[in-house]
From Swiss-Prot:
Residues noted as binding NAD(+) in the record, renumbered to the chain: 9-33
Domain of life according to the entry: Bacteria
Family: Belongs to the short-chain dehydrogenases/reductases (SDR) family.
InterPro entries to which the protein is assigned, alphabetical: BphB-like_SDR (IPR047950), BphB_TodD (IPR017711), NAD(P)-bd_dom_sf (IPR036291), Sc_DH/Rdtase_CS (IPR020904), SDR_fam (IPR002347)
Catalytic center residues: 155
GO process annotations (BP): toluene catabolic process
Classification lineage: Bacteria, Pseudomonadati, Pseudomonadota, Gammaproteobacteria, Pseudomonadales
Binding site for substrate: 142
Species, as recorded: Pseudomonas putida (strain ATCC 700007 / DSM 6899 / JCM 31910 / BCRC 17059 / LMG 24140 / F1)
Gene: todD
GO MF annotation: an example: oxidoreductase activity, acting on the CH-CH group of donors, NAD or NADP as acceptor
Keywords: Aromatic hydrocarbons catabolism, NAD, Oxidoreductase
Protein name per UniProt: Cis-toluene dihydrodiol dehydrogenase
Length: 275
């Protein structure tokens, strides 16, 4: 088990990608604190993982919630080795022209409060404990941090901001604490929700036909599941194999950046020779 004896705190760990990260960390021997707004999601984790989990119901927009999560993590497990900032919201590809004038400020504030400020607050709260453990922080980005079209104008701007945050924190905290990011593409089974300010709070990205949308444009030929993405979070949290790794963002999106102009990939031609 690659995380035996390690302790992590995962924000947004009650569903979707966050839940897959928590499940995988526990399977790899870690003990995990989870900050999530869903009491039901936290209870499901507790029933499944028992004493390996500490659940904290709270709001990632609140520094007090983050501080409570860190305090309860350290109280239960004695330390904090790895912060995983993962909680987020989506804008359902909403273009600037489609955001009403009277809602644009509110929508901007909601997006950046959760997707950017939420990470900054998590980092602020976790810093003393991470300094003591000489640990690391991992932040979920998105392929929207690299390319247009993975979200609308608000989501894409926010994810680009997160990449800047990762690089700046890696600079400010090195060499005591490593800071990195992971940028998934479309995630099958994700429960990422929309902005309340745009009346999208009851929509989930899981309703999108992601596999049909992505299989023709990704060199891998399909979208990946949350469980398939979770392994990268294990690697980034390990100590022995990641000593030189800080300020990096893994573009972990099925090869979107290497697709061709006319075809996503040419691997099918290999079948003519070797199939």
């Amino acid at each position: 088990m690659r995380l035996e004896g390690e302790v992590a705190l995962v924000t947004g760990g009650g569903a979707g990608l966050g839940r897959a990260i928590v499940d995988r960390y526990v399977a790899e021997g870690a003990r995990v604190a989870v900050l999530d707004k869903s009491a039901a999601g936290l209870e499901a984790l507790r029933k499944l993982h028992g004493d390996a989990i500490v659940g904290v119901e709270g709001d990632v927009r609140s520094l007090d919630s983050h501080r409570e999560a860190v305090a309860r993590c350290v109280e239960a497990f004695g330390k904090l080795d790895c912060l995983v900032g993962n909680a987020g919201v989506w804008d359902y590809l909403t273009q600037l022209v489609d955001i009403p004038d009277d809602l644009i400020s509110e929508a901007f504030e909601e997006m950046f409060e959760v997707n950017v400020k939420g990470y900054i607050l998590a980092a602020k709260a976790a810093l003393p404990a991470l300094y003591q453990s000489k640990g690391s922080a991992i932040f979920t980005v998105s392929n929207a941090g690299f390319y247009p079209g993975g979200g609308g104008v608000l989501y894409t701007a926010g994810k680009h901001a997160v990449i800047g945050l990762i690089k700046q924190l890696a600079h400010e905290w090195g060499p005591r604490i490593r800071v990195n990011g992971i940028a998934p593409g479309g995630i099958l089974g994700s429960d990422l929700r929309g902005l309340k300010s745009l009346d999208l709070q009851d929509k989930s990205i899981s309703t999108f036909p992601l596999d049909d949308m992505l299989k023709s444009v990704l060199p891998t030929g399909r979208a990946a599941t949350a469980e398939e993405y979770a392994g990268a979070y294990v690697f980034f949290a390990t100590r022995g194999d990641t000593v030189p790794l800080t300020g990096s963002v893994l573009n972990f999106d099925g090869g979107m950046g290497v697709r061709g102009l006319f075809e996503a990939s040419l691997g099918a031609q290999l079948d003519k020779h070797f199939g």
